[in-house]
Design a protein with these regions (language model features):
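Charged interaction scaffolds used for protein-protein
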Residues: 1-163
Length: 163
């Protein structure tokens, strides 16, 4: 998506002069180097340092603080967001967002049912084991019962000196 950015400038007036902003990925890279993540930027945790970094990347290295104080943070952030939206490619109206499953916590009911009901292990075993132990136990059980094929083993040989 970021490779299809347009090179359009967003212009706004500040203190009698016209400022031209163009969205640039280097601003985000510089912010990440300073410990400010992309998600923090668009969640609203905007600080003066973030705005100044955007202005520096936009070609205003000498006076970002003056622009920030002249306009105010919220107003400047509105202009920066407009510049980002102007640069992003237009979304295809035929593509519809399909709500996916919440990638939150794992569904432990299914896993507990697999371990406790199918493998007939006590519930204490399930809750006291790590995920790795549970997967290893399930694989051993499935191979023994014939649900899975036994993985093929490969042996590596040192071919040096065998000639």
């Amino acid at each position: 998506m970021f490779t299809e950015l347009t090179k359009q400038y967003y212009r706004f007036e500040c203190g009698g002069s016209v400022i031209s902003l163009r969205y640039d990925m280097t601003a985000f890279l510089r912010l990440e180097e300073r410990g400010i993540s992309y998600e923090d930027i668009f969640r609203g945790r905007i600080t003066g340092a973030v705005l100044c970094e955007f202005l520096k990347a936009g070609g205003y290295p000498g006076d970002p603080e003056l622009i920030l104080h002249g306009m105010g943070g919220p107003v400047l952030w509105t202009h920066l967001r407009a510049a980002v939206l102007l640069a992003l490619p237009v979304r295809d109206p035929l593509v519809i967002d399909i709500p996916g499953e919440d990638p939150g916590e794992a569904d432990m009911k299914r896993l507990r049912g697999l371990i406790c009901d199918i493998m007939r292990k006590p519930e204490e075993f399930f809750w006291s084991s790590t995920m790795r132990e549970l997967v290893e136990r399930w694989q051993a059980f499935a191979i023994a019962k014939g649900y899975m094929k036994k993985p093929e083993r490969m042996q590596m040989f040192d071919t040096e000196g065998m000639e």
